[in-house]
Amino acid sequence: PNNYALESGIYMGNEQKLGTQFILKYGIRLSIINNVGPGTIFNFDTEGNPIDSTVYENGDFFNTYVALEPRLGLVYLLNETSSIKSSYSKNVQYIQQAQNSTAGSPFNIWFPTSPNVKPQSSHQVALGYFKNFNDGMFETSLEGYYKSISNAIDFRDHAELILNKYLEGEVLSGTGWSYGAELMIKKTTGKLSGWASYTWSKAMRKIPGINSGNPYRAPYDRPNDISIVANYNLNEKISFGFTWVYATGQPVTFPVGRFEYNNTIIPVYTDRNSFRMLDYHRLDLSFTYRFNVNEDKRWKSDLNFSIYNVYNRKNPYLISFKSEIDNTSITYAEMTYLFGILPSITYNFKF
């Protein structure tokens, strides 16, 4: 079903120095969202079954949410090359995403705020240490954060997602939290530039009606994330690019058994998101040749050769479970992936 909403907001902030070593940044945002007709809003019982409904005509405004979102940041300058930064922010999200994690399905649905789906609100604090080396050639940082979330959403068990006009009845809400730390080093000058980062994180949810009310991994919980990006300028015309990424596999829910009811096979699942897909990683390489690098030339262009996923890693996109044709009592898993190695050529120009 289609849902319509109008979101508006206003923000103001300020930055000021406190003596010679402190910088204070603060601000506040006022956000408002209105659901707008045409549309039909259903009322549901505790099991997600529709009870009755209200119809709104085209242009009707209903169900307004208003929120204040403060931000606060403090920078402590230890010396000319290092600093400590801390921050707090409240964020309200009026459009939420719910993901069907069963068997690694990539099926995601976006939900605007409505009488049945409240806006997600989060409070986040962060603390980091930042240090520059070699006259700013290298930038390093170590930063940690903690976030608490209210009104996080997820689907019920065995939710019907396709062509379901009562889809909001399949949504449950609860709390969530995440925390982690990121280590980064960046080189900004010289022929070789780029950055490398490692992030360790944890993301959890606790939603009544899901996983027996016990905490479980959020769909985006990926404890380890590594990124390495480099660019080497051989001269004004020729440059090379290198990117390697790695991430822990996405949490998924796999069936561990099945039973038959009225000639229908019903899968039996484990706890929510208790399995993981295979880890994701790939290497990308590129070569760029620039024409007409002279600043006086109005017409400039470049030719780029790139290879996506150089070593042809088959990163899983979807895992489905199927029964053998000759023996339906035997079930096997089948993995689907989108892209293996993918070379490309791009010509760019500007004038």
Language-model-detected regions and their locations in the chain:
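Short loop/turn motifs that connect adjacent beta-strands in outer-membrane beta-barrel proteins
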Residues: 18-21, 81, 134-138, 191, ...
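Signature of Gram-negative outer-membrane beta-barrel scaffolds
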Residues: 1-83, 94, 105, 210
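Surface-exposed extracellular loop regions of Gram-negative outer-membrane beta-barrel proteins
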Residues: 34-48, 76, 80-124, 144-168, ...
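Transmembrane beta-barrel strands of outer-membrane/channel proteins
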Residues: 26-32, 86-90, 108, 129, ...
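C-terminal beta-signal and adjacent terminal beta-strands/loops
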Residues: 92, 237, 246-262, 278, ...
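Gram-negative outer-membrane beta-barrel transporters
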Residues: 145-148, 167-256, 348
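Residue-level signature of outer-membrane beta-barrel architecture
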Residues: 12-17, 22, 66, 74-77, ...
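Outer membrane beta-barrel strand-and-loop segments of large Gram-negative receptors
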Residues: 1-3, 7-9, 112-118, 124, ...
